[in-house]
Amino acid sequence: MYTKNIIKSFVAFTVATISLASCNTEVEPLEIVKPEAKSEQYYADLRAYKQRNDHEVFFGWFGGWNTKSANMRGSLRSVPDSVDIISIWSGTYDREDLEYVQKVKGTRVTFTIFAHKIPKAFMGGENKDQVTREGIERYAVSLVDTMKAYGYQGIDLDYEPGYQDPAGGPFTGPLVGPSYVYPDYRDNMEIFVKKLGEFIGPKSGTQYLLIIDGVPYDVKPELAEYFNYGVVQAYNSSSTSNLQSRFNRAASRGWKPEQYIFAETFEGPNAATGGVRHRLEDGTYVPSLRGMAEFLPIYNGKKATRKGGCGTYHMENDYYNWPNYKFTRQAIQIMQNHR
């Protein structure tokens, strides 16, 4: 089937064969085998496959976007064809690169924002320090307008209540708490998500994605249905049981297996090894990204047939492995067995 061949295909490489005569030093003509160009049918089938919601997806945060770099690492085009969703983490915007992966490969590209503060322009009061429903909703609409202006296909909310802000101290803001500073932060987040949900996500009736990562289960349980996916930062996960415990917390607050994506960090040394040492149910050890790809959560007393998928933070660092994106490709192939 086309779909199976698409997902299992690898980038073809130019092969040069040089034959030397055994009796003299004359070099025979160089024979170069050029990679076969992918057909229009291949790309049409690839796009159709990605439009369907019947499979686990590979999701990656892409950092250092730079199409002017010395190699392809900084380009979205370098990402394997079979990756479903790229979320831009950092870098330099390039419309041509963006539209190529969207229109040719059918890859959906979102952008990530920290969902904790509300810009002053959307705050009320004389000192612009009062949180209002109107301001929250205007902020949500402005994000959707920005998304459309730049040609993105969704928004990923980095949402980490209780965790440390890289700038120091816990993440703090009207949408994320902490509760002793913003006791109504979950109510504010509800207003924010529901307004976004009018334009993006499964409630909107559009193809635009609404994703939340970090601590998806902290939002009110009734908000889970507003998101296409929740991405848990299961960084350095040591075992299947660790993944299950993470999912249990989400399931208890309204999340379903097919919504949940488990992500490993490829920032630092993990990129070269596919993650950390991870114990499977049968006692064998594999790289943690592979463990996430193989994982199927227990839900309502039985093993799910599929989950949302798996992914990586700083996916672009897998480019340097051989072949390029080695661990990403392996994970996608494993997830093809889940239906």
Predicted regions: what is each one?
Residues 23-339:
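Secreted glycan hydrolases and related glycan-binding modules that recognize and/or cleave
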Residues 2-11:
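Bacterial N-terminal signal peptides that target proteins for export
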